[in-house]
Amino acid sequence: MDMALPIVNATAAVLARVSAAFNAPFARAVVFGVHIDGHLVVEGLLIAVIVFQLSRKSYKPPKKPLSEKEIDELCDEWEPEPLCPPIKDGARIDTPMLESAAAPHTTIDGKEVINFASANYLGLIGNEKIIDSCVGSLEKYGVGSCGPRGFYGTIDVHLDCEAKIAKFLGTPDSILYSYGISTIFSVIPAFCKKGDIIVADEGVHWAVQNGLHLSRSTVVYFKHNDMASLANTLEKLTRGNKRAEKIRRYIVVESIYQNSGQIAPLDEIVRLKEKYRFRVILEESHSFGVLGQSGRGLAEHYGVPIDKIDIITAGMGNALATDGGFCTGSVRVVDHQRLSSSGYVFSASLPPYLASAAVSAVSYLEGNPSVLADLRSNISFLHKELSGTPGLEISSHVLSPIVFLKLKKSTGSSNTDIDLLETIAERVLKEDSVFIVASKRSPLDRCKLPVGIRLFMSAGHTDSDISKVSSSLKRVSASVLSDYI
């Protein structure tokens, strides 16, 4: 409106001047008793111009259709763009196909191999009691739940599983999700919104990164597992910032980092959380059922009261030999997700037989705590056996079931590094029938930690399995990395 007013005024002034110019010659003109002035002349001219423009025929360029020969030439010359960009050699993934369950021993291409590439920490894949519970659930409920939890998808076994997990961890309530990685990237956006502040470890895995992105919050990263960096980041965000005191603030960390095998120092994180008045979201997919005297996770490992952690999430596929995930915490935290978490509201609920498997697995862990001792013994033995591996070094924590081997000397190129590591993994599988994997990352993954070889330890592995993978890695890495040692 402010810009249009001067234009209208200028137009009116021009018309007034033109009318005044015509008023003088026609000051005394009278036609059929009507006084003729400049306004009538100008308006008459405008009407004539409008009629002329409307009566003109629109311009149409002459039609010159293409001949059959020209059409054929154009078709021959046309080169369509590819539907997707070509895959570079470094991005190609030729994943071995398992032909049996992902137990400590599995089958690939008809040959039995030792499996260090699948997370089966408690060795429960193939457990007879868990299989029997699944069969009974299938006979009673069928395969699927046929709907989301809020729309005829809630089965009594879902409620039993939620109650079992909450009781096991000592929390007021818990909530089930139908897919492991969808748990964390649904929970984060359910609580964190645009304008909120999230401080996250730079080493979090892709599912956590996706949740951070979907939240649209302001995300600030601190150095991997560096509490001094976390303290400095929290200080900068809160010092003299009155606005920060009025908005929601979160710290997001993993208990055991999938990209490094390191364990987060929860006691120090809780101290900083209370000092700067942040909330903590803890992702426990690789520590639930593993850390702590009875497998209750990172809080039990550090002796931190579990109510000090605001939100805990975990996938159940790593320790419980099932699928799905859960979030646990206060009743208020859980109830909020039943209406606000996309992975819960808009996804079909966890198949009942998988919930039954989770209940049986937790019961097995409660009744057989010795399985944790077996797992820790295997991890310790593997660390000992892998010491002195040419060109590789262990960077993971001594209690982590993810034993992470990285290059002692990087080539300076992540693509070259991953090529070397994949060559090692391929030769170990081909020559010694030991299945291991390199930590290859998607182009969408923003984690910049060093790549490496991940060995997933299981309580079901034997000493001979561990000795074989160690000797194979030493022999093959000495050959592949001979120019880099």
From Swiss-Prot:
GO molecular function: pyridoxal phosphate binding; serine C-palmitoyltransferase activity
Transmembrane in keyword set: yes
Subcellular location: Endoplasmic reticulum membrane
InterPro entries per UniProt: Aminotransferase_I/II_large, AON_synthase_class-II, PyrdxlP-dep_Trfase, PyrdxlP-dep_Trfase_major, PyrdxlP-dep_Trfase_small
Cofactor(s), by name: pyridoxal 5'-phosphate
Pathway connected to this protein: Lipid metabolism; sphingolipid metabolism
Protein name: Long chain base biosynthesis protein 1a
Native species: Oryza sativa subsp. japonica
